[in-house]
Structures are given as C-alpha cells and as structure tokens.
Design a protein with these regions (language model features):
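C-terminal membrane-proximal segments flanking the terminal transmembrane helix
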Residues: 130-131, 202, 276-277
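Hydrophobic/aromatic-rich core segments of domains that either
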Residues: 143-226
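Secretory targeting signatures
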Residues: 1-27, 171, 228-230, 239-279
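A short, highly charged nucleic-acid-interacting micro-segment common to nuclease
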Residues: 137-143
Length: 279
C-alpha cells in the first residue's frame, strides 16, 4: 500500500511538471543593489536582517517575509505540491511525514557561499520546489528547508511556523496528537507543535537536537498577513530517542546573522523576564 501511494504521488508530481513546466523553473527576477541581491518583491535575498531582509530580523524580532512570496495571491508550484500531498495522503500523520521526507531526501544541504557566492542567499519555496521537481534534487541550507517545509505544510492543510534558534532555522508543524516527537513543543502556551529538522539525512519528523536544550527560540506562524512572534518552549516526552539517530548542519545562517540574532535574544530576555522563567 505504501509503495502504491509513493508511486501515485510521484506520478502526481510529474504531472505538475508536464502540465505547467514553467512552474519548475526558479525565478530569475533578481537585481543587484550594491553588493546585495533583491527580488521583484523588493526583498533582499542576500541579507536576513533589516526591514527588507528575507527574515526581517531586527532588534525587535523577526518575520520570515520571504515565505509570503508563496502564499495568498502568490501561490505557485510549492502550494500545488503541498495540495498534492494532501490529496495522496489523507491521514494527517502520514501526510506530515511524507512532506518531511520529501524535503529531507531531495534538498541537499549546501552552504550559500558554495552555491550562490554569498554568505547568505535565501530561496523562496517556489524556487526550491521548482528546482527539485525539475532536477530530482536541489541544493539548499537550513532556512531554505524551513521555508519550503512551512509552505508545503500550510498548503497541505496544516498550521506551520518557522523557528529561529542560535545559528539555525527550522520549521514547525501543528500535530497535537503526534506521539513520535522527541520533545513536546509549545508556542505561547499552545501545545502540539512538532519540530521539523530536515538538514540531517537520517532525521525523523520530530527529532530535536539536544544542543538546543536550554536555548531561547522564537517562532512565527505562517500566514498571508503578519502574525505575532511567539516564544518556543519544550519539554521531554516519554518517546525521547537517542541523539545519535539524527543530526543537523550549521552554517546556513551567516556569522553576522548569528551575532545579531544573539543580541536580539539577549534584548528579548531583558524585555520579557517573566516569560523566560516559565517552564
């Protein structure tokens, strides 16, 4: 049964490429302004910080505005792909896992400097999904994985979010009754969020890096409109697995991004001490 579903999904994905081959081509609407690269939406792809940075990371928080290039009136190949998963996998847990495996197995971790010649360069969900559909696999780093996963999950009928941790980015999917996650995650008191870390080639959906324990993290739920930033908290669950079963890659976020991010976290901790003490 599983093989039949995978075969059916493969045929459906191939259909996306045949019916609309242009969808498989990454956007070429880029222009340079000084040393920085911008897209047609006015978002800087080679910088995560600032009001026009792809993560809109400032001292006040962050907002992954690049994800909205693939939502609402801008839906394209990534949204269609997510809906294909929804049709082929009606059971929510299996659907969430198959979306995760698709990104984990087909996006090959590659640093931005090696692939694009920039310390940072973000791809939107349509560009990365299109490249995967066209070539069978495509290069990307942690924020590329997170953006694609979050858009696919939302298109497939889930609530999803992008989370920033020190030196890293990942996706979250809301699966309240999923019992295979290593840790139970909560966003501002709402439980049921599952960590989706796709840069490790052996990771399972819900695997959580032990090195993140005790680290402050924040998330933004995906929406066509700006959503409030939420603090991510977590607890050990009875299904915690050995940490040797998975991994992740650092380097997807530039050293400068890391420094700014940590300054922002420290600033956030000073602004909201009561929330930091909650368990």
């Amino acid at each position: 049964m599983k093989k039949a579903l995978v075969a059916t999904l493969s045929i459906s994905i191939l259909g996306l490429m045949i019916v609309s081959p242009a969808l498989a081509a990454p956007s070429q609407n880029f222009f340079e302004r000084g040393d920085e690269v911008y897209d047609s939406f006015g978002i800087c792809r080679s910088r995560s910080i600032g009001e026009d940075g792809f993560m809109q990371l400032t001292e006040h928080g962050f907002d992954p505005i690049i994800a909205r290039e693939s939502l609402g009136e801008n839906i394209d190949v990534a949204w269609e792909l997510g809906q294909t998963f929804a049709k082929e996998y009606p059971e929510p847990h299996q659907r969430a896992q198959q979306i995760f495996y698709f990104v984990r197995d087909r996006v090959v971790y590659t640093s931005d400097i090696d692939e694009f010649g920039h310390e940072e360069f973000a791809q939107n969900a349509d560009e990365l999904a299109g490249a995967v559909l066209e070539n069978g696999a495509a290069p990307g780093d942690c924020e590329d994985d997170a953006i694609l996963l979050a858009v696919l999950y939302k298109a497939a009928g889930f609530r999803s979010a992008i989370v920033l941790a020190p030196d890293h980015a990942a996706a979250l999917v809301h699966l309240p009754d999923y019992n295979k996650a290593a840790r139970g995650l909560t966003l501002e008191g709402e439980a049921g969020w599952v960590w989706a870390e796709a840069t490790g080639r052996t990771n399972a959906l819900g695997w959580f890096a032990p090195s993140f324990v005790g680290k402050p993290m924040f998330a933004r739920e995906l929406s066509e409109e700006a959503m409030p930033e939420k603090e991510l908290t977590y607890r050990l669950t009875p299904v915690q697995r050995a940490s040797s079963g998975g991994g992740f890659s650092f380097g997807g976020i530039s050293p400068f991004f890391s420094v700014v991010f940590m300054l922002w976290l420290f600033s956030s901790m000073r602004r909201r001490p009561a929330k930091r003490r909650r368990k």
